[in-house]
C-alpha cells in the first residue's frame, strides 16, 4: 500500500466528483468563462468540498493553475494577520497566464470574527483580479457580509450506494478481496463521509488480505450495529438490566466511546422510524433524551452513567 488512499484515489476532474452531481453541473458553467463569482462550499466533512474546489480551479485556470492558486487552512491560520499578509500579498500579484487568481480558504468557519471582517474587505478590494472559494462545515458561523458576497453551494452526505461502489473499485484496484458485509460495515460507520470510508478501508486492508466485517470492527472501535439494535430492543421491551449489561459489554469489550454510542443509538432509532417500526410520538420523546445525553457527555459527564440514564427513557 503506497501512501494514503484518500490522496491516491482523490478525483482530479469535476466529472469524477462523487455524490454531488447537481453542484458539479452548476460549477461546470464557470469553466471557460473569464470570471467566477466568490463561492462558498458548506457541508459536513468528507463530502468533497476541497476536492471539488481543486478540480474546479484546475478546470478554470488550466496549465497555470499552480501559479495562480493559493490554498490556506483557516484552522491553522485563524487570525487577522493571515488575511493582511498572505492573502493580500497573493492578491496584489498579477495573474500568470490566466484571467484571474483563486484563493481557497478551507474551514473558514474557524476564523475569528475580526479576521472574517478583514477577509470581507479583501474580497471587495480585489474583485477584478481574484476570486475566493470558501469552505466551511457550518455556514451559520460565517458573518452575513461574507455570505452575501458568495454563491453558496450546500454539499450533502454521500449516499451509501455511491460510497460502497467507490470502496469496491479501490479494493479491485489494490487487489484486495472484500465481503459485502465488510463494505456495508464501512458504509454504516462512515455516515456519508467518503474520506472516513476510504481511511477505514485502508486500515482494515492492512489487517490482512480480505476486508470483512471482523477486519472493519477491529479498526473502528465502535459497537456492532446488531448489538446496538439488540440493546435498544431490550430497553423498549422493559428489560432494563439486559440492556444495561449489553451496554457495558459493548463499551468495555468493543472499546466504544460514549459519544459514538450515542450516535449509534440515534442511527438505530432513526432507522426504526424510517422503516415504520416506531411511532413518531415515541421517537420525539427519545430524540430529546438522546440530545440531552449527548450534550452532557460532551460537557464531561460520565458516559456510562449518562447512557444508563438514557436507557431508562426507553422503558
UniProtKB/Swiss-Prot annotation:
The keyword Lyase does not apply. GO terms for molecular function: ATP binding; ATP hydrolysis activity; DNA binding; DNA clamp loader activity. This is Replication factor C small subunit. The gene is rfcS. One of its GO terms (biological process) is DNA repair. The keyword Acetylation does not apply. GO terms for cellular component: DNA replication factor C complex. Belongs to the activator 1 small subunits family. RfcS subfamily. The lineage of its organism: Archaea, Methanobacteriati, Methanobacteriota, Methanomada group, Methanobacteria. Part of the RFC clamp loader complex which loads the PCNA sliding clamp onto DNA. Keywords: ATP-binding, DNA replication, Nucleotide-binding. Heteromultimer composed of small subunits (RfcS) and large subunits (RfcL).
Amino acid at each position: 500500500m503506497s501512501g494514503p488512499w484518500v490522496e491516491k484515489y482523490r478525483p482530479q476532474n469535476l466529472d469524477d466528483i462523487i455524490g454531488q452531481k447537481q453542484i458539479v453541473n452548476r460549477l461546470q458553467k464557470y469553466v471557460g468563462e473569464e470570471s467566477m463569482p466568490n463561492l462558498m462550499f458548506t457541508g459536513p466533512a468528507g463530502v468533497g468540498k476541497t476536492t471539488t474546489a481543486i478540480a474546479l480551479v484546475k478546470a478554470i485556470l488550466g496549465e497555470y493553475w499552480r501559479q495562480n492558486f493559493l490554498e490556506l487552512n483557516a484552522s491553522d491560520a485563524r487570525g487577522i494577520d493571515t488575511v493582511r499578509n498572505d492573502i493580500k500579498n497573493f492578491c496584489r500579484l498579477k495573474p500568470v497566464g490566466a484571467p484571474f487568481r483563486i484563493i481557497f480558504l478551507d474551514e473558514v468557519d474557524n476564523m475569528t470574527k475580526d479576521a472574517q471582517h478583514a477577509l470581507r474587505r479583501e474580497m471587495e478590494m480585489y474583485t477584478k483580479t481574484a476570486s475566493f472559494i470558501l469552505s466551511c462545515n457550518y455556514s451559520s458561523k460565517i458573518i452575513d457580509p461574507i455570505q452575501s458576497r458568495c454563491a453558496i453551494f450546500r454539499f450533502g452526505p454521500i449516499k451509501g450506494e455511491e460510497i460502497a461502489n467507490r470502496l469496491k473499485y479501490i479494493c479491485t484496484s489494490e487487489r484486495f478481496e472484500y465481503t459485502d458485509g465488510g463494505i456495508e460495515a464501512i458504509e454504516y460507520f462512515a455516515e456519508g463521509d467518503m474520506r472516513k470510508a476510504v481511511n477505514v478501508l485502508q486500515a482494515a486492508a492492512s489487517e490482512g488480505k480480505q476486508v470483512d466485517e471482523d477486519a472493519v470492527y477491529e479498526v473502528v472501535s465502535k459497537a456492532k450495529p446488531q448489538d446496538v439494535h439488540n440493546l435498544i430492543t431490550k430497553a423498549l421491551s422493559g428489560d432494563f438490566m439486559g440492556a444495561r449489561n449489553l451496554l457495558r459489554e459493548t463499551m468495555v469489550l468493543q472499546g466504544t466511546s460514549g459519544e459514538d454510542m450515542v450516535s449509534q443509538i440515534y442511527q438505530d432509532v432513526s432507522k426504526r422510524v424510517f422503516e415504520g417500526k416506531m411511532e413518531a410520538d415515541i421517537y420525539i420523546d427519545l430524540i430529546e433524551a438522546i440530545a440531552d445525553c449527548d450534550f452532557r457527555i460532551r460537557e464531561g459527564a460520565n458516559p456510562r452513567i449518562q447512557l444508563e440514564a438514557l436507557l431508562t427513557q426507553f422503558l
